[in-house]
Amino acid sequence: MNKQSIELLLDDCDSDEPTRQAGAILDLVDAEVYEAAPKIVRLLKSPDAAIRFTAAEALGYLGSEEVETVGPALMNLLDDEEELVRSEAVEALGDIDYTPAVESIEYLLRKDPSALVRASAAETLGYLGKSQAINTLELSLLDTNEDEAVRCYAANSIGLLGTPQLLPKLENYLNSELPLSVKAELLGAKYWLGAKEDIAKLVNLLDKADEDFAQHILTILTDLAEREEQPTLAKDAPDLERVLRAIANRFPFTGNQAEKILALTD
C-alpha cells in the first residue's frame, strides 16, 4: 500500500463516521500498517462499542511495536460496559504479550459476570506465560458453578504454564467429577507436560465420541500437533491414524481437520 493510500485511511480513522473508521481499521490491519497503532489507540475511547471492539482487535495485530503505549490503553477497556469489548481487549493483550496485565486478567477470570470474558481470560493467561496464574486457573477449573468452556480453557492454560511437577495433581483432577470435555483438555495438558501415555487415552475418547465431542478433541489434537517442533503424536498414539480416518468417515464435516492433524504428525 502506498503512502497516499495509508494517509487516506488514517484520515478516515480521524473522521466522526464509524463506518469509515471501521473500514479504515480493517484495511490498515490487512496492509500490516504497524505505524497506524497510535492512531488506532485513540479509537479505543470511541463512544461506539463496535469501534472500540474493532480497534482493540486491530491492536492485537498492529500493537506489538508500541507495546508500552498500546498495553495500558487496552487495559483501560477491561472494565468496559460491553462484554465483547472486554473480551477482545483481553485477547489483544495476549496477542501483544503484555505481561503487566496478568493480575488484572486473573481478576476478570474469577470476577467478570460474562462467561465470554472469563473464557478469554482463561485462554489468554496461558499465552502470557506467567506461572503465577496457575492457582487462579485451578480455581476456575475446579469451580462446579463455572461455565464449561471456561473450565476447558483453564485446563489447557495450566498445561501451557505448568511443569511436570504438576502431573500428580492433574491426575487427581482427572479422576474427580469433571465434565468429559474438561477431562479431554486435562489429558492434553498432561501429555504436553510429559505424560506421554495420555495421548492414547485422548485418542480412545475420540474413537467413541459423538460429532460435537469429536470436534472438540480434534481441536485439542490440532493444537498439540501445531506446538510440537518434532512431531511425536503418532508415535505416542499408534491408533491415531486409524481413529482419525474412522472419525472422518463417520462425520464427514471433520475430514479436513483430521487430514490436517495427519499432515502435521507425518
Predicted regions and their residues:
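Short inter-helical turns and helix N-cap capping residues of alpha-solenoid HEAT/ARM repeat scaffolds
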Residues: 16-17, 47-48, 81-82, 113-114, ...
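Long, ordered, amphipathic alpha-helical scaffolds
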Residues: 179-191, 196-266
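N-terminal alpha-helical scaffold/docking segments in eukaryotic complex subunits
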Residues: 1-53, 60-61, 225, 246-266
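Amphipathic alpha-helical scaffolding segments comprising HEAT/armadillo-like alpha-solenoid repeats
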Residues: 1-12, 31-45, 64-79, 98-111, ...
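TPR/Sel1-like alpha-solenoid repeat signature
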Residues: 59, 77, 92-93, 108, ...
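Alpha-solenoid repeat junctions
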Residues: 32, 59-66, 93, 97, ...
